[in-house]
Each structure stands twice: as structure tokens, then as C-alpha cells.
Amino acid sequence: MILSKLIKFVTLSVVALTVMPCIVAAGPNVAVLAFGLVGSESVFESEAKGAAAILAQRLGAHDVVARPNTKTRRDVTIEAIGAAVRTAVDKMDRENDLLALILTSHGSPDGVAVEAGRRVEILSPSALASTLGSVGVRHRIIISACYSGVFLRPLANDDSLVITAADAKHSSFGCQDKVKWTYFGDAFFNTALRRTADLRQAFNEARAIVRQRELHYHLVPSNPQIAGGKNIDALLGETGGAQAIGHQP
């Protein structure tokens, strides 16, 4: 499947929650993994790095990895993502710790695009669910963009909070070279999550910001979604809350 077949872009962030706090000694341990999957547009590299830093600070993560594909290096493949997840989970308590996996990329109704060398592969919702299920991590959060509503059904449950920048039938916006954030990434990570450590509150604020921006530019609503995570709220509550983080342009 070629990149031109993908409509708009996708920012997918997966957070497998298996506790790991830095802020509260007795709380859950958190690992944050972020990947920018399309190197031909620098926004995905910038967003992966920025999102990882902000989420890690909010959750008090000890283990933080930001690994994007770039214009000169494209070694983040579907297999590499799976290997990184397994490495992180091997150091965690699978029942009680938190793994956050952030993926930012182009996308389609079939999943997210991964530039593997000269090829473009698709990481599907079922493949992602299989990867996370195979490592045995219980608690997870998924955050994504274009058509990312397709990830809700396979991944959202009481132990998995899924946040998407668009529903299953629409794209999200802001995918272009030489900018730092996509629309949803800017609203959720760079704005709302800097003000609050509450992911649900941050999502609601980000959804309103994105809608206002879409109206201004007369764009078809991306309709961000949130689902699942009933058991995640208590875990995140144990990490405590950091003070407001300064906004970045």
C-alpha cells in the first residue's frame, strides 16, 4: 500500500498502562515509548519527541524512548515497534505498571502508515492489539489521529483507555512538513496536557480546541473520541499531579 493511498495523517499514541511513577514513590511505574512513523514529513518526528516529553513528565515516567523515522533514517518498522514494546514490558510489573506507546503518522481506515525503508506498511488495529496482548501488559492507553476511531473497538476496555484524534470515518489535520505539531497533538499534548494531568479533562479541552480550529478553516470535523479506561483512572490517580508546564509554539 503506498503513502498516496492514505488520506491525511494519523497520530497514534498507545499507552500500555502498567504502573511506574517517578513523582510518587509508592505509585505505579510508567514507561513512555513514542514513535514518529513517517520520516518524509518532519512534523511526526517533532510530535513524537514533544509528546513523549510532556506525557512522561505528567505521568512521572522513569523509562522514556522517543524514536522517529526521519528524512535520512527509516528504521522504525512494525517489527521494531513490537521489539521496543517487549523490551519495555520485560522490565515492568505486567499487572500493575503503565506502558505508554505514542505513534504519530499518516493513516487510513485500515490503520496507521509506517515508512519501512522505501516501503509503506500499515499497522492495523488488530495487529496492534495482538502485539500488546502478546506481551501480557494489562493496562493501556491509546491515542491516535486520522481515522483512528478504528482503534476503539479492538483496544478499548476497562483496562485500556483509548483516545483518538478522529473517529473511524474522518481524518484529523495538521500533517505538514516543518511544523512541530498536528492539530490534535498541539491541542492535547502541547496545550491541554500542559495545564492538567487528568487525561480525560485534557481530552475534553483538546476536542474543543480542535473543533474551534476546524471551524475557523472550514474543515470537516475530525470528531475526536475517547473510550474505555475504567480501571485506568485509579492507577493514574496514584501518580499524583504535576504543576502546569509551559506552552511551546
Map each language-model feature to its residues.
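Short, structured coil segments at secondary-structure junctions
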Residues: 59, 135, 155-159
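A short, glycine/acidic-enriched catalytic loop
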Residues: 105-134
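Active-site-proximal C-terminal subdomain of hydrolase catalytic domains
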Residues: 140, 145-229
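Extracytoplasmic/secreted proteins, especially bacterial periplasmic and envelope-associated proteins
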Residues: 43-50, 54, 76, 80-87, ...
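Solvent-exposed loop/turn segments at secondary-structure junctions
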Residues: 38-42, 70-74, 105-110, 119, ...
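Structural recognition of the beta-strand scaffold that forms the well-ordered cores
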Residues: 31-34, 64-68, 99-103, 139-144, ...
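Disordered regulatory segments flanking catalytic cores
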Residues: 2-32, 41, 217-249
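Boundary/activation segment at the start of structured domains
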Residues: 22-96, 174, 179-182, 236-249
